[in-house]
C-alpha cells in the first residue's frame, strides 16, 4: 500500500507546513468579516449651525 | 491485480518531479486574497460566511486563551477541506491519503497543544492523566492507560484521516470497476451499480468535509484540555 510508505516524509512535511503558513494563512487573514445587517436605521446626526465670531 | 487498486495512492512523478507539490499548492487557488478595495461578490461572500462559521464553531468551546489558535485551526481546516474535495475529482491525486502528510500535520500540532498545557498550567494538564473519583487500587493502572491514550493521539489523528479517505477512494474505484465490468454481461445490474456509485460519491463528498472538520475539532478538543 503506497499511501503508507513514508518515503519523502521530510519534504512532504516541509511543503505542507510552508503551504499552510505562507499561502493559506495570509489568504485567510485578508478576509475581513462585515457586520451582520441590522434593521435599525443608522443614527442621523444633525449638527447645529453656529456663527463665526469674526463675521 | 490485487495491488493495482492501490496504485492510485502512489505519489505521481512527472520527469522526476513529485506532483504532490502541485496538488498541495493548487487547492489554495480556490481562495482569493481579497484586498481592501475589492467589491464583494457572491463567491467571496459565501467564503467569508463559511470561514466565519468554521471559526465560530471551533472557538465556542475554547476559552479566551485558546482564541489565539483561531487562524491556525481555521486555515488548517480550509487546507484539509480543499485538498479533500479536490481529491475527489477523477484522475487527481489526494495528498491527504498519504500517511506521511497527515502525521506531519498531526504530530507537531498535538505536541504544540501538549507543550502549551505543560508550560502554562502543568498541574492542570497532568491532572488529566487521572479521572476524578477513581478508586485507589485502580490508580496506577489508570494512569498507565491514560498516558498511553495521550501518547497515541497523534497517531490516531493521522491514521483516521488516511484510513477514511483511502477507504472512500477504494470503494469508489471498486464500484466503478464493477460497473464497467458488468456492462456487457448484465446491463441492468450495471445501471444499478452506477446508481450506487452516484450515492457513494455523494457520501464521499460528505466524508471529505466531515473528516477535515473532525481533524480540526479533535485538535481543538486537545487544546481545550491544555489551555
Swiss-Prot record, chain A:
Q: How does it sit in the membrane?
A: Single-pass membrane protein
Q: Where do the TM regions start and end?
A: 8-24
- Which InterPro entries does the record match to this protein? ATP8_metazoa (IPR001421), ATPase_protein_8 (IPR050635)
Q: Give the source's domain of life in one word.
A: Eukaryota
Asked whether the UniProt record includes Magnesium among its keywords, one would answer no
Q: According to its UniProt record, where is this protein located? A: Mitochondrion membrane
GO MF terms on file?
proton transmembrane transporter activity
Gene Ontology cellular component? mitochondrial membrane; proton-transporting ATP synthase complex
Looking up Pfam families in the UniProt record yields: ATP-synt_8
| Record key words, sorted | ATP synthesis, CF(0), Hydrogen ion transport, Ion transport, Membrane, Mitochondrion, Transmembrane, Transmembrane helix, Transport
Q: Name one GO biological process term.
A: proton motive force-driven ATP synthesis
Region entry Disordered: which residue ranges?
A: 35-55
Query: What's its job?
Result: Subunit 8, of the mitochondrial membrane ATP synthase complex (F(1)F(0) ATP synthase or Complex V) that produces ATP from ADP in the presence of a proton gradient across the membrane which is generated by electron transport complexes of the respiratory chain. ATP synthase complex consist of a soluble F(1) head domain - the catalytic core - and a membrane F(1) domain - the membrane proton channel. These two domains are linked by a central stalk rotating inside the F(1) region and a stationary peripheral stalk.
Tell me the protein family, please. Belongs to the ATPase protein 8 family.
Subunit: Component of the ATP synthase complex composed at least of ATP5F1A/subunit alpha, ATP5F1B/subunit beta, ATP5MC1/subunit c (homooctomer), MT-ATP6/subunit a, MT-ATP8/subunit 8, ATP5ME/subunit e, ATP5MF/subunit f, ATP5MG/subunit g, ATP5MK/subunit k, ATP5MJ/subunit j, ATP5F1C/subunit gamma, ATP5F1D/subunit delta, ATP5F1E/subunit epsilon, ATP5PF/subunit F6, ATP5PB/subunit b, ATP5PD/subunit d, ATP5PO/subunit OSCP.
| Protein's recorded name | ATP synthase F(0) complex subunit 8
What gene name is given for the protein in this entry? MT-ATP8
Swiss-Prot record, chain B:
What family does the Swiss-Prot or TrEMBL record give for this protein?
Answer: Belongs to the ATPase A chain family.
* Record organism: Anas platyrhynchos (Mallard)
Q: Where in the cell is it found?
A: Mitochondrion inner membrane
| The entry's keywords | ATP synthesis, CF(0), Hydrogen ion transport, Ion transport, Membrane, Mitochondrion, Mitochondrion inner membrane, Transmembrane, Transmembrane helix, Transport
Give the membrane topology. Multi-pass membrane protein
Pfam families attached to this UniProt entry = ATP-synt_A
The primary site where this protein sits is mitochondrion
* Oligomeric and partner information: Component of the ATP synthase complex composed at least of ATP5F1A/subunit alpha, ATP5F1B/subunit beta, ATP5MC1/subunit c (homooctomer), MT-ATP6/subunit a, MT-ATP8/subunit 8, ATP5ME/subunit e, ATP5MF/subunit f, ATP5MG/subunit g, ATP5MK/subunit k, ATP5MJ/subunit j, ATP5F1C/subunit gamma, ATP5F1D/subunit delta, ATP5F1E/subunit epsilon, ATP5PF/subunit F6, ATP5PB/subunit b, ATP5PD/subunit d, ATP5PO/subunit OSCP.
For this protein, the record's NCBIfam families field holds:
ATP_synt_6_or_A
Q: Which GO terms describe its cellular component?
A: mitochondrial inner membrane; proton-transporting ATP synthase complex
Q: Kindly indicate whether the keyword Transmembrane belongs to this entry.
A: yes
A GO molecular function term, named singly, is: proton channel activity
What is this protein's name? ATP synthase F(0) complex subunit a
Question: What is the reaction catalyzed?
Answer: H(+)(in) = H(+)(out)
Q: Name the PANTHER family for this protein.
A: ATP SYNTHASE SUBUNIT A
